[in-house]
A protein has these predicted regions:
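ABC-family P-loop ATPase nucleotide-binding domains
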Residues: 47, 52-136, 144
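H-loop (His-switch) and adjacent beta-strand-loop-beta switch element
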Residues: 168-185, 193
């Protein structure tokens, strides 16, 4: 990324369109504080979530229940609440008491998404939208929770698919060849994204 500079206000959903392999993971990790920029500074004035899909905080040989309680203690939140919330949202039933290492990638994504939403952040970082799931009930609950969080928090969704951003994004940006261009609407961002990626 080259001289990327932007500001995100609390209570906004920013959708960032970017092709795979063009700095998407780097952008998210720097916002979360997992990587430092080579130059410049990142100023954070709120509590920012770990990126959805980041498994660095959990232990795969432990069960979902054990991971919930461990992460809750790290963040100073009631372990019983975090466990109950995750059980309710991810709907893994008996698998909740099995090691994460035995989960499919879809099950891991559902668990990590539920764990992230169980914790109280001002800003949530989401890579490629909600986990893809055939579970209609999970999709319904997760969508409703995200819409509700938008009223009081900031959500940043980074994706290479404009349709993933359409449901939630209020403002948009395009990250391409190291440059980040901000737009007031997703439709404006999509026009540049389509031009850059199809030319």
């Amino acid at each position: 990324m080259d001289r990327v500079s932007f500001r995100v206000e609390i209570g906004t959903c920013l959708g960032v369109l970017t092709p795979n392999g063009t700095g998407k993971a780097t952008l998210i990790k720097m916002m979360a504080g997992l990587e430092k920029p080579d130059e410049g500074e990142i100023h954070r004035s709120c509590r920012i979530s770990f990126p959805l899909g980041f498994m660095g905080g959990v232990v795969t040989k432990h069960t979902a229940r054990e991971n919930c309680r461990f992460i809750a203690k790290l963040y100073g939140i009631d372990p019983d609440y975090v466990e109950a919330y995750c059980r309710w949202l991810c709907g893994l039933e008996e698998y909740f008491d099995q090691p994460l290492g035995t989960y499919s990638s879809g099950m891991k994504s559902r668990f990590m998404f539920s764990l992230m939403l169980a914790l109280d952040f001002d800003m949530y970082l989401i890579d490629e939208g909600m986990p893809r799931s055939m579970d209609v009930e999970f999709n319904r609950k997760a969508g409703e929770i995200l819409a509700e969080r938008l009223r009081t928090t900031t959500i940043i969704i980074v994706s290479h698919q404009p349709e993933i951003l359409q449901q939630f994004a209020q403002k948009a940006a395009v990250l391409y060849r190291g440059q980040l261009t901000m737009f007031d609407t997703l439709e404006e961002a999509k026009q540049l994204y389509d031009y850059e990626t199809q030319s």
